[in-house]
Amino acid sequence: MEARTPGAKLAGPGEHVFDMHKVNQIMGGPGYSPVFGGCVEGERMIVALMRYPAGKPSDAHSHPNEQWIYVLEGELEMEFDGKWYRGGPGHCFYVPANKVHKARNEGARDCVFFTCKDASHGLHGKKA
């Protein structure tokens, strides 16, 4: 069995702990987003520890699975329906399934966030 997301680590039988800094480092949104980091897929959930480079915007995109984004370091801004929302460490963004959105990091340093999606689809979405 292979991971739904190209390059992601697939959790196997008996695997219970993952060093997210050492699992396969992949692009979080090839062709539309500059984020990258470690990604692990289970049977029903996908988790990733991502780094969003400072000064880099994403293009508008969507994905058929819902997503949670928990900011650990730096600041992240996300746009939904023309309105921008900002969150720093401890803030959590919710992205409904199929919701077109975009993000940016206008801070002076990278943003690090933990993200979780249901595994009905892979980590990657599609450019809007």
Give short role names for the model-derived ranges:
Residues 58-60, 78-79, 95, 101-107:
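Short beta-strand His + acidic residue motifs that chelate non-heme Fe in jelly-roll/DSBH
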